[in-house]
Swiss-Prot record:
Transmembrane segments: 87-107, 179-199, 215-235, 240-260, 265-285, 301-321, 368-388
Span of domain RCK N-terminal: 407-549, 785-929
Membrane-topology descriptor: Multi-pass membrane protein
Keywords noted in UniProt: Calcium, Cell membrane, Ion channel, Ion transport, Lipoprotein, Magnesium, Membrane, Metal-binding, Palmitate, Phosphoprotein, Potassium, Potassium channel, Potassium transport, Transmembrane, Transmembrane helix, Transport, Voltage-gated channel
Protein name per Swiss-Prot or TrEMBL: Calcium-activated potassium channel subunit alpha-1
Amino acid sequence: MANGGGGGGGSSGGGGGGGGGSGLRMSSNIHANNLSLDASSSSSSSSSSSSSSSSSSSSSVHEPKMDALIIPVTMEVPCDSRGQRMWWAFLASSMVTFFGGLFIILLWRTLKYLWTVCCHCGGKTKEAQKINNGSSQADGTLKPVDEKEEVVAAEVGWMTSVKDWAGVMISAQTLTGRVLVVLVFALSIGALVIYFIDSSNPIESCQNFYKDFTLQIDMAFNVFFLLYFGLRFIAANDKLWFWLEVNSVVDFFTVPPVFVSVYLNRSWLGLRFLRALRLIQFSEILQFLNILKTSNSIKLVNLLSIFISTWLTAAGFIHLVENSGDPWENFQNNQALTYWECVYLLMVTMSTVGYGDVYAKTTLGRLFMVFFILGGLAMFASYVPEIIELIGNRKKYGGSYSAVSGRKHIVVCGHITLESVSNFLKDFLHKDRDDVNVEIVFLHNISPNLELEALFKRHFTQVEFYQGSVLNPHDLARVKIESADACLILANKYCADPDAEDASNIMRVISIKNYHPKIRIITQMLQYHNKAHLLNIPSWNWKEGDDAICLAELKLGFIAQSCLAQGLSTMLANLFSMRSFIKIEEDTWQKYYLEGVSNEMYTEYLSSAFVGLSFPTVCELCFVKLKLLMIAIEYKSANRESRSRKRILINPGNHLKIQEGTLGFFIASDAKEVKRAFFYCKACHDDVTDPKRIKKCGCRRLEDEQPPTLSPKKKQRNGGMRNSPNTSPKLMRHDPLLIPGNDQIDNMDSNVKKYDSTGMFHWCAPKEIEKVILTRSEAAMTVLSGHVVVCIFGDVSSALIGLRNLVMPLRASNFHYHELKHIVFVGSIEYLKREWETLHNFPKVSILPGTPLSRADLRAVNINLCDMCVILSANQNNIDDTSLQDKECILASLNIKSMQFDDSIGVLQANSQGFTPPGMDRSSPDNSPVHGMLRQPSITTGVNIPIITELAKPGKLPLVSVNQEKNSGTHILMITELVNDTNVQFLDQDDDDDPDTELYLTQPFACGTAFAVSVLDSLMSATYFNDNILTLIRTLVTGGATPELEALIAEENALRGGYSTPQTLANRDRCRVAQLALLDGPFADLGDGGCYGDLFCKALKTYNMLCFGIYRLRDAHLSTPSQCTKRYVITNPPYEFELVPTDLIFCLMQFDHNAGQSRASLSHSSHSSQSSSKKSSSVHSIPSTANRPNRPKSRESRDKQNRKEMVYR
C-alpha cells in the first residue's frame, strides 16, 4: 500500500536496523508506540511474528529521528489489507444517527403542520356544506364520517396506551420505574468503568468481539441503553426537546459506535467518556432510594456530582485529542497521555495553578482549554467553597446522638439562645445537686453563634448540640427521643406575640408526643389560657410527669403573695434557684441575705424513726437536731375513688400522724444535708449533737437488706435513682379537719353561692364592668385603706397579661370574706375590658380608668394608704430596645416614690391588719378590731359611695396617724415587674448596685420590691429533678389551683359558682402565708435579743405556725438609728440567729374555722358614725400584755417609729 511504502522508505533511509522486509512492521510498531506508551500490549493480536515485532519495537523506541519521519496513520496490526484508521466511521455513525433523527423529527413536524393547516381549511368547507345541506340529510351523509372518526379514535387510544405504558416504565413513581432508573444509572457507571480500563489501550485498536470480554460487556450494556432510549422516546411528549437532551446526546455518541466496532472488528475509544455526564443524576437516584432526605444533603450531592462529571468529561476529551493529534496535521502532533494525567491537567487548570509539567500540545486541545478555563474557573471558585461549607457544617452539627450505657440524657429544644442556655446550664449543672449523671442534648434548627458555641465547648462532657427541628421525625430519631429521660421546651419570654410563641411550643409538644407518646415533657408557657390546649393532646398526662410551667401564672402568683406578705416572692424565687454560698465577713445586710440565698428546696423520704409522730413534732425535731426545715409532706389518700389521690399538704398541723414512706419537703443548703432525714435513727443518733455525723447506720443497713413488701415508689431525680422505702405514705387525720364541724355546717347557707365549684376561691355572680368603674371624682370621695392598687399599662392592642392569675391568690377561700383586700385597677379601660371576662366572678374589685403616671389618679385611690402597689405593663415586649422595655414601670415607680402626702387624712388604727394566732384569747372585744364598710355622702351626687377601710375600736393600742408614716411615696409598699434584669438599677436611686450585678444580688430584689420573670427559668431544671417541687410552688403561689380546676377553666374560661357543701368547705382548710410582727403580742419577749429557734419552737407548739424566714429592716444591724424603712429577706435562719424587735417573721398559718362565724355587717351612715359601725373579724391584733416588763427607752422609740408594722400581713 502507498502509505505503507512511504513508511518503509522512511525507515530504511533512517538507517534503522532490520532488513527491508521488516520496514512495514517497524513503521507500524513505531506508530503504535506513538499512540500508546505500551506498544507490547497490542502486539498480542499479531500472528507468528509477535516476538520479533516486540523486539523491533523496543529497539526502535531509542531512535528519536524515526518519530519525525514516520507518519502514524496505520495501526499496530492492520485489520484489513490497507491498514487504514477508521475513527471517522465511528464518529459518522453517531453524527448520522443524531442529525438523521433530528431531520426526521423536523420533517414530521413540518408535514404535520401542513396537514393541520389543510385540514383546518377543509374543515371549514365541510362545515359550510353541512350548514347548507340542512339537518334533514345529516344522518345519511355523516355516517361514513362517524365511522372514520371512530377508527381514528381507536388509533389514538392505542398510541396513548403505549405512551402511558412507556411513561410508567421509566417513571420513578412506581417500583418498576425506580428499579429501571437505578439499573440504567448503575449500568452507565459500569460503562464508565470499562472506559477507564480501556483508556490504557491505544485510542484505536483492533479488537475481536468474540475474544474481548470487556467489549462484550460493553455491548450488553449498550443494548440495554438502546431499549431504554426507545422507552424514553415513546414516553416523551416533545420529541424534538427529547432529542436534544443531554442524556440523549450521550446515547447518540456512545451506543452506535459499539455496533460499528463489532462490524469492523476494531475499537475506538472516542466519545465514550460522555458516560460521565450520567453522574449528574446521582442525587435523583439517591432521592428515589430515600437515602437523601434533607435539603443540605441533596444540595451537597448535586454540587459534587456536577463538579465531578464535568471534570471527568473534560478530561476524556483532552485524552482523546492529545493522544490522537490534529487531523489537519496528519495526526503528527499527538502526545501520549494517560487518562488520569488528563484528569490532573484539568484540575490544575480549573484551580488556575498550572504547574506546566503537563500541558496540551494539539491545537484542538489548546482551543478546548481556552474555553474550558473560563467555565471551569467559575465552577471551581463557586462550587468548591460551597461544598466545603456544607461538608463542614454537616460534620459539625449533623449526625445522631450515641447513647452512653448507664447514663440518661434529656433533649432541650425551643428558644435556644446564649441567655436561655446559660441560665439553664447554670442551674441544671449546679454543684449543690449532687452528682448529675445526665447528658443534655440541645436540638435547634439554627446553628449556634460563636458565643453559644463556646458555651457548649466549655460543657462538652455533658452537653451536645444537634441542628434540626423537633417537628421533623427524622431529627427526633437523631437525638434518640424515644430513649430520652425527658424533653424540655424553652419559651421566648421576650417575644412580641406570646400567643404565637405558645402555639409554637404546643406544636412541638404535639410533634414529640406523636413520635413517642410516653416521653415526659416539661414545657414553658407564656399565657395561662393557652395551657388548656395541652389538655387536647391525648397522650398529655400530668400524672405521668408532664408539666407546663406557665410563666404568667407563676409571675403574677408570686406578686400576689407579695401583696399578702411582702418579700415572699424573693424568698420563693431563691428557694427553687440553685445559688452557691457566698461568704461575707463584714456585718452587712448582704451577709445575712446571702446565707439564706444558698438554701434550696429538696424532697426526701422520712426515716422510720418518725413513724407515729405528728407533723409539728417531726418538724421541730428536724429543725433542732437535723438542722433541716420541713414545710410540707406528700399525702396519698387511701380512697381510690378520690379524683386526686396524691396531694401535697403544707404544714398540716398536729392532727396528722406520719407513717412509713412519707415524702417530706425540706429547705436546706444542699442535697447531702437532706439525707439526714432519711438516715436518722433514734437508737443510733439520739445523742448525736453534730448533724454532720448523722449518716447511714447499722440499723438501716439491716432494714435495707430486708426484702421489700410493698410496691416501689416513683424514682427521685436528684441525679439518678434513689433507694427509698417502699411504702406509700398513709396519713391519719381526724374527720373534723377533713369535713367542717357541726357548728360550721349549721352556719352554711346552701342557697347562696359564695365559693367556686371547687371551694378553693371566693366567688360572686358575674358583674358588668360598668358597675365597678369609679370616676376620679368618685374615687376621690372614697376613703380606701388596706387595699391593693394595681397600676397596669396596656391598650387595646397589647397582649393580655392574665390578671386573673393576680386576683385568684388574693381571693383564696382560706381567707374569710372580710379578710379579703380590696383590689383597685388603675389603667386603660380599653385594656381592662378585654381582661374583665376573667375577673367578673371575683368580689371586691374596682377599676379607675386613667394612667398610673397621673398623680391625680394615684391620689384618688389613696395610694398612700394601700397595703401594696403593684406595677405591671402589657407593652414591655413591643419594644426592640431591651433597655427601654421597662420604661413605663420604672417611670411609674419613680413617680410614686417622689409623691408627698399631707396630714388631712383621718386617724386609723396602726395595727388594723393584725392577726391573732389561732388559740389566743378572742373573747375580749377589746382584742377584736372592728372592720367597717361605710358610705360617705358624695358632695357632687349625694349618693352613698363605699368607703372601704378598716377601723379599730379604741383600746389598749394607741392611735396613730397613718399619714405620719406614709407622708412620702418612698414609704409606700410597692413591687414592680421587670423584663430586663439590668433595669433593676434604675428602681432605687440611693442603692450602690453595679449594673453588672446579678438580679438576685441587687437591693430591690432582696427587698422584694422588684420581680423579673427570668428568675422562673430555674423551675425547668427543678421540675425535672423533682416534679413535686412545681406542685408545691403552685400550691403556695396560686392559692390552690389544681389540674382539675384548669380543666374546668379550659371548658368555660371562667370560674363556676358552687353551693357550700361539706366537701367543698373542706378545701378551705389549708395553710396560708402571713407575717408575724415581734413588736407586740406573745412573741414580743423574743423580739428583743431572743433566738430564732426559740421563736420557731414556740410558734409551732402553741399555735401550729411554721416559721421559715425573717423580713428585716436593712439597717437593723447598725448601732445608730436609721430612717430607712427598706427590708430584706432572710431565708431559714439558724436556731441561734438573734432577733430584733422590728423583725417580721414569715410563717405558714393554719386556717381558723371559727373566726368567720359572726357575719360582717354593712352600715350605711354618715362619716360621724364610723365608731359605732362594727363587724367581727378573724383579723385580730395581738393584745398588749399588762404584766409585760417595760422596755428601754430606745425600744420605745423604735416602737413608735414602727407602729405601722402589722402583726400579720
